């Protein structure tokens, strides 16, 4: 299983703080899950605490983090 963790406003947007999903080949495949449909395209993505893109391969027990973009000055 893959553990998906949502941070900041994405917890409210997606309706969960943590979700477990079956293993799929890539992060992009994982993001096609209907429960993740509201996720904005500019979301920051990480796999096992390293920034990742949609082509990043996934494996059993990976942790995926979904974070809103950071802004400020």
Label every model-predicted segment:
Residues 1-72:
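Ubiquitin-like/PB1-type beta-grasp interaction modules and other compact soluble beta-rich domains
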């Amino acid at each position: 299983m893959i553990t998906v963790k949502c941070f900041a406003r994405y917890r409210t947007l997606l309706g969960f703080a943590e979700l477990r999903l079956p293993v799929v080949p890539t992060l992009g495949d994982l993001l096609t899950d209907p429960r993740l449909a509201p996720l904005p395209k500019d979301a920051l993505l990480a796999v096992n605490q390293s920034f990742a893109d949609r082509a990043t391969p996934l494996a059993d027990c990976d942790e995926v983090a979904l974070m809103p973009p950071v802004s400020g000055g």
